[in-house]
Amino acid sequence: ALSSAASDVYKRQVVGILVEDQNSIYGLEHLKNANLIHICIMYVGLLLAYMKIKQKGYFWEKVNNGDLYIPEKLFEKVACVAVLFVLFQFSFQGHMILSGVDRGIVRSSIGVWGPLTTYVGRFGMPALLSLSTVLYFYIYDHSKKINRQYVIVVICGILVAIMAGGKANIVMMFLPVILQCGGFLKKRYLVTFVLFGALSIVIVGMFQMNMSFAQSVSYNIYRATSLSNMGTLCVWDKFPTGDPQAYMSLLIGLGERIISFLFDVDRHSVEFLKFSLPRYITYLYYGNAQGAIDGVVNLTITSFGEAVYWFGRKFYFIASLIFAFVLYKISIWVFKTRKKDYLLKNVIVSVFFTSLCLGWLNSTSGCFLSYFFGFTSLVYLFGTYMLIKYVLKGSSLNK
């Protein structure tokens, strides 16, 4: 049998449970209340943004073909690029994902192609979907050719999302579509999207983990509830007063390889983990220390976990207020660019919101600044800008 001390160590390493004061695990009641307060503060930011957007009337308006001529070749170009993305994703990553190789192993094995597959899955393809959705839903007349090409773009989006490997990738891929045309769609279509997204998560889980349908449903419920909260629980336990070295997470925005070069630290070493909060917490608590070192396993840490990481249990709300303000400004920014003359800017901002902002709320790297404005994020956004500029080249939309 394990001794009492050994038992405590085992609990900390494997399941992240530490009874600090013999009264509560993680200070559970305080944790739940703090998390609820954090969520409420964030929702207030969104509510204020919605009120501002509605007051100013920041919405897309229908565009007559006579007012703004959109040639069919524009949709044809979007569809061609989307097909190329599918072929690229399959060649470098998709064939392994579809054959059942774990996503973490795929991510660590494709080397220099990794950033490009990430770009296609998280930025390039969502940008094409965002652009084509605006063009499709806010033009009065559609030809059969445009209808067919829009369907091709949507199908390509589904295929790229599946080959990205994540179970929620299809949902994340089509968030720009819902963002652009959500007010235009009838409720039954929105419900259909939610059901389709949930079903896709289950089906992808079946193929990835060789599970039955029922097993995949059960696992994904567990993954979306207990396991997704574990990283935040561990941050709450590990940093009751915040981490004095939290500023180190600012550097992760440079990218792991650049950090490794600048500081002469192997990115697959224990010493490197101080730069990556998710990998560090995974190393300490998850029970797969080598997986954390190799970068193939990560616990999810939410924006609330980031707030605790920086300010501790007592003053986390300072970060919550900052995050709510950031969310407020970005949300308004997305809708404020909904003008025909700002189409390029709107697509970039929309992808920034869905791929970076919403992604950060659910899974932080340790600092939203490095997540939003890190070197890799800026490169991806610049690549997206060049992509959409190329697609719009020669069109009256590109002003």
Predicted features along the sequence, with ranges:
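Membrane-embedded catalytic interface detector for glycan/lipid assembly enzymes
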Residues: K52-R188, G197-A214, N362, L369, ...
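Small-residue-enriched transmembrane helix-hairpin modules in multi-pass membrane proteins
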Residues: S108-T117, G205-F323
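Juxtamembrane "helix-exit" motif on the non-cytosolic side of transmembrane helices
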Residues: V14-Y26, G94-M96, W360-T364
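Membrane-interface segments at the starts/ends of alpha-helical transmembrane spans
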Residues: V19-I37, V112-P115
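Hydrophobic cores of alpha-helical transmembrane segments in multi-pass inner/ER membrane proteins
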Residues: I37-G57, M125-Y136, P176, S377-L392
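Single conserved hydrophobic/aromatic residue that forms the stacking wall/gate
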Residues: A1-A6, Y10
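Hydrophobic alpha-helical segments
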Residues: L299-K399
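Hydrophobic alpha-helical transmembrane segments
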Residues: Y150-I152, V171, V194, F317-I318, ...
